[in-house]
Amino acid sequence: MATIKDVAKLAGVSTTTVSHVINKTRFVAEETSKTVWNAVQKLNYSPSAVARSLKINTTKSIGMIITTSEAPYFAEIVLAVEEHCYQQGYSLFLCNTQNEPEKIQNHLDMLIKKRVDGILVMCSEYTRNSLELFNATNIPMVVMDWGKAHEKNDRIIDNSFNGAYLATRHLIDNGHKDIGVISGYLTKTICSERLEGFIKAMKEANLPIREEWILEGDFEPESGFEQMNNLLRLDKLPTAIFCFSDTIALGVLSALSEKGIAVPQDISIIGYDNTHSSRFFSPPLTTIHQSKSRLGVKALNLLLERIKLGHKEYQPHTIEFHPELVLRHSVRNLNKSEE
């Protein structure tokens, strides 16, 4: 395997000159530079990435720790981050944790050994232990938190309350008075805020809120499927269901399809997140849009800013998003039915 000394000997220059040409750290005459590159190609010389990173104090790599990249919501954020990393000349190490402290610790250790320039942390929830692990490292880091503000964490404000209010108002405006909910874990801030938005819209319209129609899932299709079947066992069904995620709605649609119940003819469904696949559901899902790509890009830009600052003190940032209603074909207008 060729070394930098071999390149220097063939090009008739010093190893220092070869280093400056390859790393572009100093001006080198065009003719000399061309001679060096010809020698590099002839010898098939490949500089050691580790050696270069030690010399210029950067590996041009980013670590990303997330709950799971399988969930459509996180998958779309990861895609945006990876694409933006590529555009900025960075490689991305992706680490799934399933919110397990041991995995978080192991992934952190691995990223530190890889000498990544920075770490982007984006989990659906944090334990005190995981936050302590993140805060203990000196690597530039952006910790995105959907929950209450923490001293060192950057916060995402997705206005879940407003999004849920918007979704519920859409159902009410389409003549629905009996509305059910299938949520994620209500201990999570985003879910409790969405439930509050639902309740506000219902109370403003003087509509009854039936506790047996408020069911708790876990954001996965399986829980949507299971809770929809639980609803179907009741004597009276709602005319519409507000699902707190598109993945929950997918499970709900599957359960209804198995029972031969048509959407939206027999029951209306509205989702949340506007994941890429929601437009291909049967029927295409009316939902609440959140810009996952914009979130990913903003979070990465924030991290790149931290990397430039080095160890200087910085203030936590807030990234705020405003939900929008996306109209498709899963909600029936009952007002037209009565005309």
Curated annotation (Swiss-Prot):
Residues 4-23, 48-56 bind DNA. Gene3D superfamilies: 3.40.50.2300, lambda repressor-like DNA-binding domains. Coiled coil: none annotated. Pathway: Purine metabolism; purine nucleotide biosynthesis [regulation]. Hypoxanthine binds at Y73, K188, F219, D273. One of its GO terms (biological process) is purine nucleotide biosynthetic process. Keywords: DNA-binding, Purine biosynthesis, Repressor, Transcription, Transcription regulation. PANTHER family: HTH-TYPE TRANSCRIPTIONAL REPRESSOR PURR-RELATED (PTHR30146:SF148), LACI-RELATED TRANSCRIPTIONAL REPRESSOR (PTHR30146). This is HTH-type transcriptional repressor PurR. It comes from Haemophilus ducreyi (strain 35000HP / ATCC 700724). The lineage of its organism: Bacteria, Pseudomonadati, Pseudomonadota, Gammaproteobacteria, Pasteurellales.
